A protein has these predicted regions:
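Hydrophobic, well-ordered beta-alpha structural blocks that scaffold small-molecule cofactor pockets
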Residues: 1-63
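Rossmann-fold NAD(P)-binding glycine/threonine-rich loop
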Residues: 99-126
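Generic structural signal for hydrophobic
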Residues: 45, 87-88, 110
Length: 134
C-alpha cells in the first residue's frame, strides 16, 4: 500500500449498503468447498452479477488479481487473513471481516494503518442490498 492511500483511507468508512454497491470483490477463504461460507459468498456474489476473485484456494495472493479490487471479504482464519493483508500491495476501498475471521491482532493492524474495514456479513448484504434490491 502506498502511504498516501493509507492516509486518505483514515476518514473513509463504508456501511454494508455502500459495500454492496461496489462491483469487484476479492473473497479470501475456501471458495472450493461447498460447505464453507467463502464458497457460499462467492456463489451469491456471482449469481447477482458481481465480479469475484478468490484468494486462498484459487489465487494465492490479492496481488495475483488482475485489475482493481473494490472490496476484500475476509472469510478465512484470522492469522491467514492478516498475512494476506500484510503482503497486499493493491488498493481497495474496504475490507469486510466476516464473523470468525476477526482477531485483535488483525483489527489492531488495520486501525494502525488507517485501513477501512467493516465487521459484517456479505451474505446479509446480498439479501438486503444486493443487485436487484433497492
Amino acid at each position: 500500500m502506498q502511504e498516501s492511500s493509507e492516509q486518505d483511507r483514515e476518514t473513509e468508512k463504508m456501511d454494508l449498503k455502500e459495500i454492496m454497491a461496489q462491483r469487484v470483490f476479492a473473497v479470501a477463504g475456501d471458495t472450493l468447498n461447498e460447505e464453507k461460507y467463502a464458497y457460499k459468498i462467492k456463489q451469491g456474489l456471482l449469481a447477482q452479477g458481481y465480479t469475484v476473485y478468490c484468494v486462498g484456494k484459487e489465487l494465492k495472493s490479492f496481488n495475483d488479481i488482475p485489475g482493481d479490487i473494490d472490496i476484500i471479504d475476509m472469510c478465512i482464519h484470522p492469522a491467514k487473513g492478516l498475512a494476506l493483508i500484510k503482503e497486499c500491495s493493491k488498493d481497495f476501498k474496504c475490507i469486510v471481516i466476516q464473523p470468525g475471521a476477526e482477531s485483535g491482532e488483525l483489527l489492531e493492524y488495520l486501525d494502525e494503518r488507517g485501513l477501512p474495514y467493516l465487521q459484517g456479513c456479505v451474505l446479509v448484504g446480498l439479501s438486503v442490498y444486493g443487485r436487484g434490491r433497492s
